[in-house]
Design a protein with these regions (language model features):
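Transmembrane-lumen/periplasm boundary regions of multi-pass, lipid-linked membrane glycan transferases
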Residues: 1, 36, 131-134, 140-183
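Extracytosolic helix-loop segments that constitute the early lumenal/periplasmic catalytic or substrate-binding loops
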Residues: 1-18, 24-28, 32
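Loop-to-helix entry region of an early transmembrane alpha helix in multi-pass inner-membrane enzymes
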Residues: 23-31, 36-57, 76, 88-91
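Hydrophobic core segments of transmembrane alpha-helices in multi-pass, intramembrane catalytic enzymes
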Residues: 52-55, 79, 94-106, 142-149
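Transmembrane-helix signature of polytopic, membrane-embedded enzymes
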Residues: 59-81
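Membrane-interface transmembrane helices that cradle and orient dolichyl/undecaprenyl
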Residues: 67, 103-124, 129-132
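Short acidic/glycine- and proline-prone juxtamembrane loop motifs at membrane-interface regions
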Residues: 84-97, 137-138
Length: 183
């Protein structure tokens, strides 16, 4: 228990198709559903559906913060009926988690800039961005680049202090470090 077929304990990347690597987060999210419902299409697809629905909620909340309630309702409606969103919420494909966890990170980062619980929300955003690393292999390039650009922008605009940027980086690194070690 807790090992792949090569004997690696709780691997960060799973071997797929005999040679390639597959992001592990979706597989780990499936475990409790497979335990409860058995191995079937519903238990394999349910985690993706739940994350997709939470992604729609995060899209609405972020849009409401950024553009107001009316615009957020329109954005939410288009997101809910978008063919891409409908299809990706049905497929148990590991990379389909990435846009949702990225959106969760953006949502919490945006809230951290406005809210009273600034440090908690900033750390939560970095946890979400760190989990992005386990959703899609290309995140090894996109996440550090995005975080560096966001950090520079927020420091220039004086929306975060230098010590907050270091704290955020430490949280992101703590979550992403196992992934970075095996890449």
């Amino acid at each position: 228990y807790g090992t792949d077929h090569y004997g690696m304990s709780y691997p960060v990347h799973l071997t797929a198709w005999g040679y390639g690597q597959m992001s592990a987060l979706l597989s780990y999210l499936m475990v409790p559903f497979i335990k409860v419902f058995g191995l079937n299409p519903v238990s394999a697809r349910l985690p993706q559906l739940i994350v997709s629905l939470l992604g729609l909620a995060a899209l609405y909340l972020f849009s409401r913060d950024a553009f107001g309630r009316k615009a957020a309702l329109v954005i939410f409606a288009f997101g809910a009926i978008a063919p891409w969103h409908i299809m990706q919420s049905r497929w148990a494909l590991d990379c389909n988690l990435y846009p949702h966890f990225f959106l969760f990170g953006i949502f919490f980062l945006n809230r951290s800039l406005k809210a009273g619980r600034r440090k908690l929300l900033l750390c939560l955003s970095m946890v979400m961005f760190g989990l992005c690393m386990y959703c899609y292999g290309v995140s090894i390039y996109t996440m550090p680049l995005f975080l560096i650009m966001a950090c520079v922008y927020l420091l220039i605009k004086k929306q975060v202090k230098l010590w907050e940027a270091f704290m955020a980086f430490a949280v992101w690194l703590a979550v992403a470090w196992p992934f970075i070690l095996v890449m």
